[in-house]
């Protein structure tokens, strides 16, 4: 499974540098209805231990001004704590790019190589 530059903690997103733009879509955590809707999705409170997780690669940009990299870091840590043997949960942090906008061709190729490498490894695919 691959998740690129995700927003995972909806209760904190409005406090992020670009968070004000997400309020219209996701609501404010001070509003009871928004809090009730967003609370079950928090990576710090959800429990993926109830079922096995697939191998995962999450990506983020170290200097992303649109999506706080802490979202991917927290989600990765939570999933790693619940991962099954042989099902790695990996975080790829790009030091020179944000969430894809302005990424160089070599950065895009490097990220896609990692995505496909994990997929091929998990499917047991080998070079001929």
Labelled PLM ranges:
Residues 1-128:
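Active-site-proximal cap/loop segments of hydrolase catalytic domains
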């Amino acid at each position: 499974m691959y998740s690129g530059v995700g927003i995972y903690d909806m209760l904190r997103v409005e406090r992020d540098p670009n968070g004000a733009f997400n309020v219209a879509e996701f609501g404010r955590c001070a509003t009871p209805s928004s809090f009730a809707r967003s609370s079950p999705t928090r990576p710090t409170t959800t429990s993926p231990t109830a079922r096995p997780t697939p191998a995962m690669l999450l990506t983020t940009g170290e200097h992303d001004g649109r999506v706080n990299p802490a979202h991917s870091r927290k989600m990765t840590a939570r999933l790693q704590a619940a991962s099954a043997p042989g099902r790695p949960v990996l975080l790829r942090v790009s030091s020179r790019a944000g969430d894809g906008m302005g990424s160089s061709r070599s950065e895009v190729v490097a990220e896609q190589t990692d995505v496909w490498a994990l997929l091929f490894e998990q499917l047991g695919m080998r070079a001929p």
